[in-house]
Structures are given as structure tokens and as C-alpha cells.
């Protein structure tokens, strides 16, 4: 890998993946343990949505226990709720904001500036922004909330950042700088990414959307469902372990580790060295060296009888984060679930009123700005609809000859409709 020879000559980019974001934690732990130079010498860490949280954890030097416990706490919260993500108590943005204020240091904005790049989508034009400079701690936390804010899933009013409204960065740029030859990309979805799961059966079809490529397969489809509808904590933990194994495969195929760990899991001795130029299959588009060891096997979590031998720290963090207290075990048991559903007609109205009232009280300080924004959006939409209706009615009521003459006159004058004129976009300071 030529670009790894220069210190600070590469970046790491983590895709948005919702609850599948624990996959990034496994990848990060493998890089820290097997190839720490890739983490220590990286110039910048980019991320969108949940990938930005993992990039933040790397910049601040957070342990695997910190990342696993915070994400799996939210998964266990959804597991306890009788209606899952549809329960009125479910508020991912509020939960993450609270955790950020509790755990981030006072100088987090200074530590993150020029080291962390957060992808955000401006509402309503959908333009992508990558913010790398943060003025205050509150502004940094607000940027993280913006890149995590999936419309309707997290709420209906997009959060504000520097006077504008932003939503999930994965909707416009899911894998920042993935086309840069010095960027190592990571995604829990199979596609043209450096570190990602490898499907057993290869798909001939590929979907390119949101600046990322995904193979069209049933496995990717179910991974997408798990990213918004979290499964049991143990299943999410297995995706974290798979991230560790996929990162290890990436390192061994490119000769960045000396020990043939993956071959020791499936056989006693590795075969003869098989090197070849970059192929056109799963790893197409990866920015690495001239040769790749394609003989390195793809190992799944089920093939590893004792994951603790590979990474004791990660395994201990996952087991600790998956533990449930007594009351949670009662709620998640079959009798507890049956009782919760039987009492749902009685408890749901009170729970709905309580949680909605609490969110209303929390929203009141931001109500004036949000109402002004809603009024401006309604006004601009009304004027646009009125203008379109007016022009349509005028064209409908004018004779055909008049419409042709007006079009010819405009063509002779060399004017064009205003909709074809280029727009001037304003970028934030510190943008790449």
C-alpha cells in the first residue's frame, strides 16, 4: 500500500449504518490491535450517521467498552419497549444527545477540529456538507445530532446548525471521500468497500446511491432492516465480531500483519503464497497496493469457537454490554411480553401522554426558532405553488400562436428560464 508509507497520508471513512454501527467498533478494535499504525497515523476520520460516532470515539481515544455499552444500551431499551421503535418512549436523538453531554470532555470541539469530518445533508435542497471545524462544545454535539437525524424516524423538525437545518448525512454522502485513492472505507454492507462483509454468493447487480455502492442481495436487505429495526443485543454483538474478522481479512490480504490468523481458524497451515493484481470482484475500487493475497479465507463468526482468543478486550466489552438486569430479563421473557401486550390498552394512553408532554416541555426553548423556520418553509412553498399555478393557467388560457411567439421572442433575445440558471452555494468554513 503505497500511500501508507507517508505519515498522515491516508484517511478512514465510516459509512452510516444505524444499529449496525457496532460493526465499525469491531473493525476499529482489530486495527488498534493488529495494525495500530493505521489508526495513529491517519490524517482524518470521516463518518456519516452512526459512522460519525465511531470516528468520534477514535479521535477521543475511547475504548471498545465505551462504544459497545452506549450502543447496546439503546438496543436493550428498544428490546424492553412493548412496541419497539414505535413506542412513544423511543427517542434515539434525545438518548444520544444525553449520552454525549455526559461523556464528552469540555474541549471536545478542539480535539475534533481538523481531525474529524462529519457528513450532513442540508434540508430541504439535499446538498451535502462535511464539517471539520467546530467552534464550541455545543456546536460539535449539535453536528453529531444532525448527521444522525433520520426524518420521521427521529422526529419531524430537522435540527439547526449554524442557522440552517440539517438531517442524516447518509442521505447525501454515506461514505465521505470514498473515491479518494488514499481513503480506507468501512461499511457493514457488502459492496465496493475496503472493509465490509463478503457474501458467500456473489451478486451480479449493484446499486449505487448516496455516494456508496451496495450489492443487491438478500443479506444486504436484511442488514438494512437491522439498521433501523434493531434485533437482539446478541445478534448486534455478532455483527461487531464480524467487523473484527473482516478487518483482519483486509489486513492479511494486503500483508499488513505477519501472523496468518484466519488460516489458523480453518486449517493448520496456510497454502503457498498466491498474489495477484487487483481484481474486479468484491474488492474492486479499493485503494491499496499493487498485489493482494486472494487466498486469505473469509471467516464468519460461527467459524470461530472462542472469539476471546482473538480479542479478549472486545469479547469482554460485548459480554458486559449484553448483560441484562433482573427487571429487564423479566420484561423480555415470554410471560413478561404477554403481560405487557395484555395491559397495552390500559398503559399506552398514559405512556403516550407522559412522554409527549415531556418532549413538549423539552421543545419549548427551541419553539420560537422552529416555528419561524416552519413559517418560512410554508411561505416559500405557498409562493412556489402559486407561481407554478399562475404560469400554468396563463399558458392554458393563451392562444397557441401567442405561446409560440413568446417562445420565439425569448429565444431571439438569448434568455433562458430562471430555473436553468446556476445556483451559488455557500460553504461553511473548514469544509474540504
UniProtKB/Swiss-Prot annotation:
Organism encoding this protein: Mus musculus (Mouse)
Motif DGA/G location, chain numbering: 168-170
Protein name: Patatin-like phospholipase domain-containing protein 5
Gene label: Pnpla5
InterPro entries in UniProt: Acyl_Trfase/lysoPLipase, PLPL, PNPLA_dom
Keywords: Hydrolase, Lipid degradation, Lipid metabolism
Residue positions of the active site: 49, 168
Keyword Lipid metabolism carried by entry: yes
Pfam families per the UniProt record, alphabetical: Patatin
Enzyme superclass (EC): hydrolase
Entry EC no(s): 3.1.1.3
Function recorded in the entry: Has abundant triacylglycerol lipase activity.
Catalytic activity: a triacylglycerol + H2O = a diacylglycerol + a fatty acid + H(+)
Biological-process GO terms, alphabetical: lipid catabolic process
Chain spans, region Disordered: 404-423
Motif residue range(s): GXSXG: 47-51
